[in-house]
Swiss-Prot record:
Protein name: Phosphonoacetaldehyde hydrolase
GO cellular component, one term: cytosol
Family matches, as PANTHER family: PHOSPHOGLYCOLATE PHOSPHATASE (PTHR43434), PHOSPHONOACETALDEHYDE HYDROLASE (PTHR43434:SF19)
Function: Involved in phosphonate degradation.
Subunit-structure text: Homodimer.
InterPro entries attached to this UniProt entry: HAD-like_hydrolase_sf (IPR050155), HAD-like_sf (IPR036412), HAD-SF_hydro_IA (IPR006439), HAD_2 (IPR041492), HAD_sf (IPR023214), PGP-like_dom2 (IPR023198), Phosphonoacetald_hydro (IPR006323)
Required cofactor(s): Mg(2+)
GO aspect biological process, one term: DNA repair
Signal sequence annotation: none
Length: 264
C-alpha cells in the first residue's frame, strides 16, 4: 500500500487558523435581520458550500423559530439568496486577510512532495472566493497541485465528487491510495464517501474554533478536554485517524503503508 496523494481542505486546515473568515459574516447577515445566532450555530455547518451553509442555518430549529418570531413566517429561498448575496459581498472584501498558511503546513507539503506524494485540495468556498484565497496563499508559499471547488462538480460536501475530480486530475487510483485531510465534520463525510483514508486535524480547526492565542493561553486541562471533544466528533463522523497538528500527518502515512492497512 502506497499513499500517492493527499487532498487537503483549505480554511481551518491549511490556511486561516481557526477558520474565522466566514464566521462573523454569517452572524452579521442574520443580525441585520434581527435574528441573533451564536458562534456555535454559525460554525456547525462549516465545510459546506456557503449557500448551503446559509440554508442549513435557517433550518436549525432555534434559528427558524426566532426568524418566525421576527417575520411571522419561516425563511424562504428568496431570504436565503438575499443573505447569501450579502455574505459574498462582505466575504470577498476580507478574504485576502485570511489566506495565511497555518504554521508548519508549507514544510509538511514540501516533505510530502519529496516522497512523491501529489497534493490536491477541496473546499466549501466558491471558485470566485478561491481565486482570491489561492492567489494570496500562493504568494505566501502554499500552492497545491490541484484545486476543486463545489462550482466545478454537481454538488459539494458531503458528496465525494470533488475528491473524485482530484483523483482524475492527479491520476491516482484506487481511492484508498489517497488521504483526505480536513477540519470539519463535512470533511470527514466527504473523505469517507469517496472511499479515502480520512484524517481530522484538530488545532486550528473550525471544530475547535480557537485562535492561536487562545490555544497558547488556555489552561492545559481545559484545552485537552476541548481537543478530545473534537477528536471524538471526527471519529464519530468517519475519521480513520485524528492529528493535533499537520506535523503528525507523515506518521499516519507511514503507519498506513507499513501496516498494509485496509479501509473498513
Amino acid at each position: 500500500m502506497k499513499i500517492e496523494a493527499v487532498i487537503f481542505d483549505w480554511a481551518g486546515t491549511t490556511v486561516d487558523y481557526g477558520c474565522f473568515a466566514p464566521l462573523e459574516v454569517f452572524m452579521k447577515i442574520f443580525h441585520k435581520r434581527g435574528v441573533e445566532i451564536t458562534v456555535e450555530e454559525a460554525r456547525k455547518p462549516m465545510g459546506l458550500l456557503k449557500i448551503d451553509h446559509v440554508r442549513a442555518l435557517t433550518e436549525m430549529p432555534r434559528i427558524a423559530d426566532e426568524w418566525k418570531r421576527v417575520f411571522g413566517q419561516l425563511p424562504t429561498e428568496v431570504d436565503i439568496h438575499e443573505m447569501y448575496e450579502e455574505f459574498e459581498e462582505i466575504l470577498f472584501s476580507i478574504l485576502p486577510s485570511y489566506a495565511t498558511p497555518i504554521e508548519g503546513v508549507k514544510e509538511v507539503i514540501a516533505s510530502l512532495r519529496e516522497r512523491g506524494i501529489k497534493i490536491g485540495s477541496t473546499t466549501g468556498y466558491t471558485r470566485e472566493m478561491m481565486d482570491i484565497v489561492a492567489k494570496e496563499a500562493a504568494l505566501q508559499g502554499y500552492k497545491p497541485d490541484f484545486l476543486v471547488t463545489p462550482d466545478d462538480v454537481p454538488a459539494g460536501r458531503p458528496y465525494p465528487w470533488m475528491c473524485y475530480k482530484n483523483a482524475m486530475e492527479l491520476d491516482v487510483y484506487p481511492m484508498n491510495h489517497m488521504i483526505k485531510v480536513g477540519d470539519t465534520v463535512s470533511d470527514m463525510k466527504e473523505g469517507r464517501n469517496a472511499g479515502m483514508w480520512t484524517v481530522g486535524v484538530i488545532l486550528g480547526s473550525s471544530e475547535l474554533g480557537l485562535t492561536e492565542e487562545e490555544v497558547e493561553s488556555m489552561d492545559s486541562v481545559e484545552l485537552r478536554e476541548k481537543i478530545e471533544v473534537v477528536r471524538n466528533r471526527f471519529v464519530e463522523n468517519g475519521a480513520h485517524f485524528t492529528i493535533e497538528t499537520m506535523q503528525e500527518l507523515e506518521n499516519i502515512i507511514e503507519h498506513i503503508e507499513k501496516q498494509e492497512l485496509i479501509i473498513s
